[in-house]
Amino acid sequence: MKFETISPNGVSITLGSSQDGDTNKVASPKALMLSSLAVCSGLDVVSILEKMKVNLEDFKINTKGSLTDEHPKYYNKVLMQYHFFGEDLDQEKIKKAVNLSITKYCGVMEMFRAFAEIKTEIHY
């Protein structure tokens, strides 16, 4: 089952539930929430690090969520793993950028705090 939604800025997004064997997989609404959390924080972190003149070869965020057992099922625990790649990375600046994102700038993070315990890890 699939649904198309149009965001306020006019972008079309297809969401739904994929069954085993589906050739046209779609993201579930809950999976999109985790993706939104990662992108929100990632945008902050990259912007802050650019202002700090930190050069990265690559940057990735993995998010993992644990759902409650009872309905309505929602994420009650989320692990965010920040992975930074490059030579001579300034770990203090990276820690500061991640901290600013998770404590000050990322609005999606603030929304998640209302219902989930969020843990973060930084990997170099």
Q: Can you describe what each PLM-predicted range is?
A:
Residues 1-35, 46-124:
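Extended beta-strand/beta-hairpin segments
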